[in-house]
């Protein structure tokens, strides 16, 4: 069966959307929301959730490389602890915290895949959530104590942040925004919440990207991409994602997440205005 040319993603889309993915994936401004906005604004069509999920593999590879030492330490401690109770230290517990914290989004993502793809990728929803969730950032900064260090992380924190990660399935929320806000609410230091947010995202996003790989070539919704386009897009997302991680960790050391709210609210209002005037379609 011949693929309809109009349903094939273009190279310009591939490059631009991969740049957007790399720059926004780790910032609390919603990469999925920005991809949706840019796709509609410049091409009048949605590239699709499958393309997004696969290109996310590039940004998640950036996390693996950036936190390679931390990940190796956690994995080593976890495996040692499985076979020797005397070696069940913090890294062993951290391994379980990442696993348990990943379960909520894995379950919800699988069960609600069709609902997310068919009903939640609406531009009005994206714009509304960009605005509404900005006030969650502000509240988390205002009422979170931000005192607890990395070695004070608990399984309760992992469960709460893991549940918050489910909100990232809605375009406009932001994976890091949801999990970091939850971390701030339970009293974690801003940088601690951000670092754990990155670690927590790895299993779920890698699984989502690999699971969506076949669908990206012939999607039920959105546009199809070639293997070369997916490879180039993933590479671009990796390079920019790595730089974005380094920048964000430095930024949160001395700046409030409320700065991102100051960006999200005008963007959400602008999108609503474009929708209302017919310059964008929902």
From Swiss-Prot:
Source organism, top-level taxon: Bacteria
Q: Which reaction does it catalyse?
A: di-trans,octa-cis-undecaprenyl diphosphate + H2O = di-trans,octa-cis-undecaprenyl phosphate + phosphate + H(+)
Entry's Gene Ontology cellular component terms = plasma membrane
What is the protein's name according to its record? Undecaprenyl-diphosphatase
The record's annotation in PANTHER family points to:
UNDECAPRENYL-DIPHOSPHATASE
**What is any Pfam family matched here?**
BacA
Give the family, as the similarity comment puts it. Belongs to the UppP family.
Its main subcellular localisation, reduced to a broad class, is: membrane
**Source taxonomy:** Bacteria, Bacillati, Actinomycetota, Actinomycetes, Mycobacteriales
Name the top EC class: hydrolase
Query: Could you say which EC number(s) this protein's record lists?
Result: 3.6.1.27
Question: What are the GO MF terms of this UniProt record?
Answer: undecaprenyl-diphosphatase activity
Asked if the record carries the keyword Cell wall biogenesis/degradation, the reply is: yes
Q: Which residues cross the membrane?
A: 96-116, 123-143, 198-218, 229-249, 260-280
Its subcellular locations are:
Cell membrane
The record makes one more remark, namely: Bacitracin is thought to be involved in the inhibition of peptidoglycan synthesis by sequestering undecaprenyl diphosphate, thereby reducing the pool of lipid carrier available.
């Amino acid at each position: 069966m011949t693929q309809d040319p109009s349903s094939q993603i273009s190279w310009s889309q591939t490059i631009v959307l991969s740049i957007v993915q790399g720059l926004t994936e780790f910032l609390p401004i919603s990469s999925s929301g920005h991809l949706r906005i840019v796709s509609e604004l410049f091409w009048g069509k949605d590239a699709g959730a499958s393309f997004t999920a696969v290109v996310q593999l590039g940004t998640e590879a950036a996390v693996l490389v950036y936190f390679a030492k931390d990940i190796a330490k956690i994995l080593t401690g976890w495996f040692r602890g499985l076979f020797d109770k005397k070696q069940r230290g913090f890294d062993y517990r951290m391994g379980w915290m990442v696993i348990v914290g990943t379960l909520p989004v894995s379950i919800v993502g699988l069960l609600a895949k069709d609902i997310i793809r068919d009903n939640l990728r609406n531009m009005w929803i994206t714009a509304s959530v960009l605005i509404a969730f900005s006030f969650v950032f502000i509240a988390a900064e205002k009422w979170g104590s931000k005192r607890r260090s990395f070695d004070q992380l608990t399984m309760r924190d992992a469960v709460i942040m893991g549940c918050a990660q489910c909100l990232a399935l809605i375009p406009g929320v932001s994976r890091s925004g949801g999990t970091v806000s939850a971390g701030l609410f339970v009293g974690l230091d801003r940088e601690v919440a951000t670092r754990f947010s990155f670690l927590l995202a790895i299993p779920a996003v890698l699984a989502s990207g690999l699971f969506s790989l076949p669908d990206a070539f012939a999607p039920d919704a959105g546009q199809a991409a070639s293997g070369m386009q997916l490879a180039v897009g993933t590479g671009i997302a990796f390079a920019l994602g790595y730089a974005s991680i380094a920048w964000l960790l430095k930024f949160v050391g001395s700046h409030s997440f409320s700065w991102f709210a100051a960006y999200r609210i005008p963007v959400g209002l602008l999108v609503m205005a474009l929708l209302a005037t017919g310059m964008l379609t929902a």
